[in-house]
Swiss-Prot record:
<dbReference type="InterPro" id="IPR037004">
    <property type="entry name" value="Exonuc_VII_ssu_sf"/>
</dbReference>
<keyword id="KW-0540">Nuclease</keyword>
<keyword id="KW-0378">Hydrolase</keyword>
<keyword id="KW-0269">Exonuclease</keyword>
<protein>
    <recommendedName>
        <fullName>Exodeoxyribonuclease 7 small subunit</fullName>
        <ecNumber>3.1.11.6</ecNumber>
    </recommendedName>
</protein>
<comment type="function">
    <text>Bidirectionally degrades single-stranded DNA into large acid-insoluble oligonucleotides, which are then degraded further into small acid-soluble oligonucleotides.</text>
</comment>
<dbReference type="InterPro" id="IPR003761">
    <property type="entry name" value="Exonuc_VII_S"/>
</dbReference>
<dbReference type="GO" id="GO:0009318">
    <property type="term" value="C:exodeoxyribonuclease VII complex"/>
</dbReference>
<dbReference type="Pfam" id="PF02609">
    <property type="entry name" value="Exonuc_VII_S"/>
</dbReference>
<comment type="subunit">
    <text>Heterooligomer composed of large and small subunits.</text>
</comment>
<dbReference type="GO" id="GO:0005829">
    <property type="term" value="C:cytosol"/>
</dbReference>
<dbReference type="GO" id="GO:0006308">
    <property type="term" value="P:DNA catabolic process"/>
</dbReference>
<keyword id="KW-0963">Cytoplasm</keyword>
<dbReference type="GO" id="GO:0008855">
    <property type="term" value="F:exodeoxyribonuclease VII activity"/>
</dbReference>
<comment type="similarity">
    <text>Belongs to the XseB family.</text>
</comment>
Length: 80
């Protein structure tokens, strides 16, 4: 259940960030509104980056060695 909540929180933060970007790109906000939206966008970006960093740390590759499963950190770079 906690995984779904974290996923929903990330997805909601990302959707909110996208909506803020659209509002800023429209150019219809006042300077004060734009600054407030930018500040909120920075906070949402940090939240999303934190969630992605946590997810990356949790992702592990299971390898079978001598009949036992061993965890290895996830390597995002494919091997050549």
């Amino acid at each position: 259940m906690a995984r779904k909540k974290a996923s929903i929180d990330f997805e909601q933060s990302l959707a909110d960030l996208q909506a803020l970007v659209e509002r800023l790109e429209n150019g219809e906000l006042s300077l004060e509104e734009s600054l407030a939206a930018f500040e909120q966008g920075i906070a949402l970006t940090r939240d999303c980056q934190g969630a992605l960093a946590q997810a990356e740390q949790k992702v592990q590759i299971l390898l079978e060695r001598d009949g036992e499963l061993a965890a290895q950190p996830f390597d995002a770079e494919p091997e050549a």
